[in-house]
């Protein structure tokens, strides 16, 4: 979202509203609306999905307003839920607001980001023909607490009345209204008061490394960035605001573990061994809840795979998954709040900040040389393992290749800032196509095994169990057929990934950098 300000100004402290209106009244007839006052709560997803698309959303009680942040134009006003904590697009009644929010938010919840008190009035400026030529809004914005008070003047032009608007600007300037400001100043300051700022979080790994840094310095920054993501997602995972907090938490843990296994002899061996175990433990303890999340998020897809007569048979299955998830969520909450988990993260932070007593052999080499070695090693491993796959390859071997692709992607993301952005993005897109197929294949394999075990434990007898068995059997067949189809898609994707153009670009980027270091 752009930060507008050309048509918004600070109102000088010495300027009274009545004096300003008197000045405008010398050239226009004024139609002043009643004064408004409200304390609004701005809301967005944790990763700013609305803001990224140019929207701001706030509520006053159950009255919600969505508007374009750049222009200030209202998109839709509608009733909705009371924002006492997290809420989802599905919590809004059917209507335009819900229809707008659903594709933008997806499975992410809305969270309160800033509380701002607004008061002001709107004035229409009319010419001699009683035509509205412009609108002025005089507004006071004050973030919650003892935040500063911002007195603003906003000008909204009307198409076709450029001369009149130029006259308004001149009158404002004559009254000392000169300093432009973003109309979002209250929102921005309100976010800052709550420890946030727009676009301060993204699930994507982004980090600009210094090409002149050592391997130890670069890896320290990478691990610190991942640790920040872990710490930022723990509250949402513990409070269970939405499933993406746990997902992003686990991705940051997994990236940390991959870094420790990928980048050898940069940190001391004892440090690597200790924290590989620690982060492995955190990954294991957060896994069951995430696994259940995946099944529950697929509920609609599972039901749509079945004939209508079989769909009701899944109700008991999902009820049991929801019950198990509640149990696992409570276990995970206790783990993440426990002293041991906090001690692991605190110790990791201290270790990254402290100088190593005995530097590792590769700690001082240039990061560019190290990155080229690691990426090319992983690339060659993916090519080797991928060429061994065929239609009869066991699922476990496909899973192993998926892990190798993931390690290659993590390595490329860690060091991407050291290489030409456009070329790296081309390679990452090719790799992602391959990863998506392998990931879907593995998910289908795991899901079939879970369904098989559920069927095995299902006791014969009640009609409800028979209906569930029929539904699970039909679902397993559907998942199996999709998995088989993916094998041929994999062959196509791997051929493209391993073609001369892609392999040539890998060698050009990463071997050249490696050799130049």
Predicted regions: what they are:
Residues 1-517:
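Function-determining surface determinants
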């Amino acid at each position: 979202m752009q930060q507008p300000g050309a048509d918004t100004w600070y109102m000088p402290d010495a300027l009274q509203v009545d004096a300003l209106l008197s000045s405008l009244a010398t050239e226009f007839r004024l139609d002043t609306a009643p004064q408004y006052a409200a304390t609004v709560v701005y809301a967005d997803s944790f990763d700013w999905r609305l803001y990224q698309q140019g929207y701001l959303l706030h509520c006053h009680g159950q009255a919600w307003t969505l508007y374009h942040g750049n222009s200030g134009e209202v998109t839709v006003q509608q009733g909705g839920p009371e924002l006492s904590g997290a809420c989802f697009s599905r919590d809004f009644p059917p209507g335009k607001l819900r229809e707008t929010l659903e594709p933008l938010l997806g499975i992410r919840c809305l969270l309160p980001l800033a509380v701002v008190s607004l008061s002001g009035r709107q004035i229409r400026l009319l010419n001699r023909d009683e035509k509205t030529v412009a609108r002025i809004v005089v507004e006071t914005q004050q973030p919650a607490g003892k935040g500063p008070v911002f007195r603003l003047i906003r000008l909204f032009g009307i198409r076709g009345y450029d001369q009149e608007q130029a006259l308004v600007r001149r009158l404002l300037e004559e009254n000392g209204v000169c300093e432009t400001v973003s109309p979002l100043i209250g929102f921005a300051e309100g976010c800052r008061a709550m420890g946030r700022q727009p676009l301060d979080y993204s699930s994507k790994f982004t980090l600009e490394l210094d090409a002149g840094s050592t391997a130890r310095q670069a890896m320290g920054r990478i691990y610190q960035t991942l640790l920040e993501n872990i710490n930022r997602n723990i509250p949402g995972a513990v409070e269970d605001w939405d499933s993406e907090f746990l997902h992003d938490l686990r991705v940051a843990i997994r990236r940390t573990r991959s870094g420790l296994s990928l980048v050898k002899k940069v940190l001391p061996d004892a440090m690597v061994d200790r924290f590989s175990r620690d982060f492995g433990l955190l990954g294991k303890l957060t896994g069951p809840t995430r696994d259940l999340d995946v099944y529950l998020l697929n509920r609609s897809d599972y039901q749509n795979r079945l004939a209508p007569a079989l769909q009701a048979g899944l109700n008991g299955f999902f009820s049991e998954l929801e019950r198990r998830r509640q149990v696992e969520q409570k276990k995970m909450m206790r783990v993440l709040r426990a002293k041991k988990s906090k001690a692991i993260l605190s110790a990791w932070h201290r270790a990254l900040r402290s100088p190593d007593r005995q530097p590792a052999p590769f700690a001082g080499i240039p990061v560019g040389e190290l990155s080229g070695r690691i990426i090319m090693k992983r690339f060659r491993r993916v090519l080797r393992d991928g060429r061994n796959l065929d239609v009869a390859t066991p699922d476990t071997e496909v899973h192993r290749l998926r892990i190798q692709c993931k390690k290659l992607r993590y390595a490329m993301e860690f060091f991407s800032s050291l290489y030409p952005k456009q070329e790296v993005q081309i390679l990452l897109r090719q790799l992602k196509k391959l990863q998506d197929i392998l990931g879907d294949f593995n998910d289908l394999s795991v899901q079939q095994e879970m369904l098989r075990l559920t069927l095995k434990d299902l006791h014969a007898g009640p009609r409800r169990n028979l209906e569930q068995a029929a539904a699970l059997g039909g679902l397993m067949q559907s998942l199996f057929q999709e998995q088989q189809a993916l094998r041929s898609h994999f062959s196509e994707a791997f051929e493209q990934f391993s073609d001369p153009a892609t392999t040539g670009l890998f060698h050009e980027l990463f071997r050249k950098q490696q050799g130049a270091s």
